[in-house]
Design a protein with these regions (language model features):
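Alpha-helical transmembrane segments in inner-membrane proteins
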Residues: 1-257
Length: 257
């Protein structure tokens, strides 16, 4: 949201979640169609591995684009286009797949925290920690970007380097969580606004740790509610996230008026 200067921006804008979804779709839906399901490598890779490979490909693309494209709007458009292309390929695979394969992919796409094993957690935690450390190292750059890229540049900030680090951090965090837990929406969009409301501060030295804490508590509450009523966690995050988004839109409209 700070980089794009857009209160309705979220981590999925970069197409990372779409990359993970495409990787999983190719594993569940595409491998049987193409006759690849018998390969031992694909069988051992699993849903998480295929999702992470899809994420890694998009991560590489984001890093290259952010270094080459000067205008931040260009990066945003490229991310959205990646999402549309991935979505189109997934729809084609869904159309050609069997009911059993569709069910498996649909269950993954609903998102869940309950299917992560201890072994997977051992892989997930180090990658997430790396992403968090990169984001913490970008705190000064993010504070400068609050006043716009031109101001940050006059203060001696390397825009390309900082932007690349921020995107890599976002891609690592979003892509890893999506690969392991499925695409859980609205948390990345709503939680930063809830954090700003609670702490009443725009300083990223407070916002980033605050967002970690608020996101942790919010996601845990959503998961508890989802388990109690036997619902997909995505439904609960959407029900709680939509009012926050509507509040942000209403607040911005009042500012404009």
């Amino acid at each position: 949201q700070t980089v794009f200067q857009n209160p309705l921006a979220d981590p999925y804008l970069l197409g990372v979640s779409s990359g993970a979804g495409l990787g999983v779709a190719l594993f569940i839906l595409g491998a049987p169609l193409l006759g690849w399901s018998e390969f031992p490598l694909l069988q051992s890779m699993g849903i998480v591995g295929s999702g992470w490979i899809g994420t890694a490909v998009i991560l590489l693309g984001v890093a290259i684009i952010s270094r080459k494209v000067k205008n931040i709007l260009g990066v945003l458009i490229m991310g959205v286009m990646i999402g549309y292309v991935a979505g189109a390929i997934i729809q084609i695979l869904q159309y050609l797949s069997s009911a059993e394969q569709l069910k498996m992919f649909t269950l993954w796409s609903m998102g869940s925290l309950s299917h992560i094993t201890t072994t997977q957690l051992g892989i997930m935690i180090p990658i997430v920690c790396i992403g968090l450390l990169i984001s913490i190292s970008c705190i000064k750059s993010l504070n400068l970007l609050l006043l716009g890229e031109n101001y940050a540049r006059t203060m001696g900030m390397n825009i390309k380097r900082s932007r690349t680090l921020i995107f890599v951090s976002t891609a690592l965090l979003t892509g890893t969580v999506t690969a392991f837990c499925g695409p859980v929406g609205f948390i990345g969009l709503a939680v930063p606004h809830i954090t700003r409301l609670i702490f009443n501060n725009a300083d990223h030295r407070i916002l980033i740790p605050g967002t970690m804490l608020t996101g942790l508590i919010g996601m845990l509450l959503c998961d508890i509610i989802a388990k109690k009523f036997l619902l997909p966690v995505n439904c609960i995050t959407a029900l709680l996230g939509v009012p926050v988004i509507l509040w942000v839109i209403a607040k911005n409209l009042r500012i404009i008026k």
